[in-house]
Amino acid sequence: MGMTHPPNNDLARRMAELARAAAAPRSVEQVLADVTAAAMELIPGTDTAGVLLIGKGGKFDSVAGTSDLPQRLDELQMLFNEGPCVEAALDELIVRTDDFRSEDRWSKYSPAVVEIGVLSGVSFKLYTADRTAGALNLFSFTPHAFDAESETTGVILAAHAAAAILASR
């Protein structure tokens, strides 16, 4: 049995790997898939992750999902014109929902995701100094899955994703 490293060592190691990988010629989709995979690995409680991109003319695009679920959740947000991923992409830096069963910010979206089995989530704006690219979105099948440490790690991953997106445009 090997030594277990403290979580921040894992974070530092994974971020270094992501940075090196991003330096290689790769598509944005590949970089974002690396980021969502890293989120699954580094942020306890994450059952699925994806990225919602804002395209030209404000069109949204769901990419880099670790399952089909993030795209379904993004589609519900488009349908209802409300939800945490859209809010993070457009307005807030971090949007955390501890329990969708008691979440009243999104009257249509919240009950729809509970029906699917998603009970908590956290979304991070992907932005640089002058432009917004979208949101990194993490979801869990358990309530209260995310905490301040989840947010810290997510912000770092989101910054990496944003840099990769903007470098490619």
What are these regions (language model features)?
Residues T4-V63, R72-D74, E82:
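Helix-loop-beta substructure at the N-terminus of cytosolic sensory domains
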Residues L52-I54, S62, P70-S107, P111-L119:
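Regulatory sensory and allosteric helical modules in signal-transduction proteins
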Residues T48, S110, S123, A135:
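Short hydrophobic/aromatic beta-strand element in the GNAT-like acyltransferase core
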Residues S120-L126:
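Short hydrophobic beta-strand micro-motif common in sensory/regulatory domains
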Residues A135-H144:
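Short beta-strand-to-loop transition segments that serve as allosteric relay/switch motifs
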Residues V155-A162:
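Allosteric cytosolic regulatory segments
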Residues N8-L11, D147-G154, L166-A167:
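Interdomain signal-transducing alpha-helical coiled-coil linkers
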